[in-house]
Amino acid sequence: MGIRFGVQEEHSFAANLAWAEKQAAVQVKSAANALEASQHVLSYLEALWSIEKDHLHIAVDVSSFPRTSLVAIYSAIWASARASRPISVSFLYSFAQFTEPPIDHGPITEFGAVSPEFSGIGEADFGLATLIGLGYESELALAAQQVMDPALTWLAVPQSLDVRFDDAVRKANDLLINIVDERNVWSFPVDDPYSTFVELEMISHGLQRTHNVVLVPLGPKLLVVACLLVSSIHRNVGVWRVSPGGLREPREQLAAGPVAYISAIFSGTH
């Protein structure tokens, strides 16, 4: 199933849509928002359950999803899973060719939990610890740090297959990197999402003993998935977003070739 969101349908979208509609095995569904996308996924999964009674294995390509829709689709899969009918999910990400950072990311219009179920559960006597993923959007990362004003700040710096991307991200976020304790600047491998998840879970597990923890996954989409997985395990850990919403100017992205993925089993609890 492919989901069409009806916004920012520019650049190579028409060619991609034409290809998908020619594939007999692909159902193209239109979704006006993240809720409709999640409803399409729930219906799709229920149809699969009518065929496979015990266990599903699905793949979700997160490369082009808006983050709000990614969260909604993740939640829909979680809602469909049961202990008696688990769902194995592989989240895939196709790396894009390097492009220079955009000059303007647009004004910030959205800030808060990615959805109510990922808002986190705070302890009244704990301070706030925030882990912010870094990407090209340096002003969004700075805004998250300044608005949340945490007692402790961690930064997640992506290490990609292209050193030009790494250099551009560090250059864009130089101010924030320099004001955060270097011991709290964590580099994670974009091409190894399982290791990223394991390390993120360890960091979050340690922080939650003394702090209310909020993860803000700017940067690569697989970091969003890792944060959602961690929050699904540690329900007191929140996942928040800061975004210009639909005001960001769309850009053409070409696949570089490599694909990374992380797999998890959803059973209605974790």
Regions found by a protein language model. Name each.
Residues 6-10, 34-39, 61-72, 95-99, ...:
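Gly/Ser/Thr-rich loops at beta-strand to alpha-helix junctions
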Residues 65-70, 85-116:
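Active-site histidine-anchored catalytic micro-motif
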Residues 134-203:
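Redox- and metal-dependent alpha/beta enzyme cores, enriched for Fe-S-associated oxidoreductases
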Residues 105-125, 134-142:
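Active-site glycine-rich loop that binds ribose-phosphate moieties when present
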Residues 85-102, 235-267:
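Short, flexible loop segments at boundaries between secondary-structure elements
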Residues 45-49, 192-211, 223-231:
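A short, acidic, amphipathic alpha-helical segment used as a generic capping/interface helix at domain edges
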Residues 1-47:
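An N-terminal, globular interaction/scaffold subdomain
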Residues 1-8, 90-93, 152-163, 241:
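Short internal beta-strands
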